[in-house]
Curated annotation (Swiss-Prot):
GO cellular component annotations of the record: ribonucleoprotein complex; ribosome
Protein name as catalogued: Small ribosomal subunit protein uS11
GO molecular function: rRNA binding; structural constituent of ribosome
Annotated source species: Pelobacter propionicus (strain DSM 2379 / NBRC 103807 / OttBd1)
The keyword Cytoplasm belongs to this UniProt entry's keyword annotation: no
Family under the similarity heading: Belongs to the universal ribosomal protein uS11 family.
Source domain of life: Bacteria
Gene Ontology biological process: translation
Function: Located on the platform of the 30S subunit, it bridges several disparate RNA helices of the 16S rRNA. Forms part of the Shine-Dalgarno cleft in the 70S ribosome.
Pfam families assigned: Ribosomal_S11 (PF00411)
Length: 131
């Protein structure tokens, strides 16, 4: 006979009082990930296009990135976050729309920096698509 299922006790997220933070927008060709942390690097909130219910090629759209950024901003504002530095990484289509969504959410953006890694002729890139 199977043993009864154990209840999983989830730890309630405590409300930190943080005013300054860092937002990382990672826009890939397939998805957009937004992470908001405090200045020490402790993550306050995160969200992705896939976590917001978009599947397949819809994850890579600017609208999906906007929805994910709005969700992440709402979670971070529960901790009292007001001022944000934004780091954008990747070539995806959700870069600008995620940034605009963070701005529209009421964050005071102090600076925006593009931290996309650029190879000095490193790995061979993927072959071109033939449609």
């Amino acid at each position: 006979m199977a043993s009864p299922a154990k209840k999983v006790v989830r730890k309630k997220r405590e409300r930190k009082n943080v005013t300054n933070g860092v937002a990382h927008i990672h826009a890939t060709f397939n998805n957009t990930m937004i992470t908001i942390a405090d200045t020490a690097g402790n993550v306050l909130a995160w969200s992705t296009s896939g976590a917001k219910g978009f599947k397949g090629s819809r994850k890579s759209t600017p609208f999906a990135a906007q929805v994910a950024a709005e969700d992440c901003a709402k979670k971070a504002q529960e901790h009292g976050l007001r001022n944000v530095e934004v780091y954008v990484k990747g070539p995806g289509s959700g870069r600008e729309s995620a940034l605009r969504a963070l701005q529209a959410a009421g964050f005071n953006i102090s600076f925006i920096k593009d931290v996309t890694p650029i190879p000095h002729n490193g790995c061979r890139p993927p072959k071109k698509r033939r449609v």
